[in-house]
Amino acid sequence: MPPLADHDERRATVAEVAADLIEQRGLDAVTFREIADAAGTSTAIVSHYFIDKKDLLRFTYGAAASRARRRLDAQVEAESEVDEKTLVGAVEALLPLDKGSRRDWRVWFAFWGLAVADPDLAAEQRAHVRGARDELAGLIGRLVTLGHLPEDLEVEDSARDLLVVVMGLAAQAVFDPKDWPPPRQRAFIARHIARLSRG
């Protein structure tokens, strides 16, 4: 691992290595020894930046969630006009459509398994899900205000439903990618959002 002056940058680098290990070999591969070996550094360096495995996993999960949020934000900001296509693009930004987003979903699924029995990790998971849901609700609300979606649409319920659809679709796509290639994922989401438009 090259020398890095910035503490946060070093933590992010270690978390990237951890995410790669989770994707390739699962959570059991995430030990300070395995991470140090993969990063070409020592366990002392890894333990300098993370108190324990839980701290490392929480940070790795948070980094994956932040990447998804940045993809969503970038998609919305790239649209010159806010319309139904904006919502489709925002949802697609959350799906496992490429190598990076598939890795992020694998990290999330691994983390969720731990969060079932750990209240701190469960709270972290809830916070990230609520953040994504709130962002989708904000976008859906704008589309209702602009007349692109029915005025009687339940915004909060629609955002909640849409996020559940994303999570279910992502699970199918990550664990059965041949059956759920990116074009099929996109078509599925487009159909779901078209149903929102019809009310």
Name every feature range the model reports, one short phrase each.
Residues 59, 70-105, 155-162:
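Hydrophobic alpha-helical connector segments
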Residues 13, 17-25, 71-75, 107, ...:
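Solvent-exposed, amphipathic alpha-helical segments
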Residues 1-9:
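N-terminal intrinsically disordered/low-complexity leader segments
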Residues 62-68:
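Short, basic, alpha-helical segments at the C-terminal edge of helix-turn-helix-like DNA-binding modules
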Residues 2-3, 102, 120-126, 130, ...:
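Hydrophobic/aromatic-rich alpha-helical bundle segments in the mid-to-C-terminal region
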Residues 89-138:
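Short secondary-structure transition hinges
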Residues 13, 17-59:
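Helix-turn-helix
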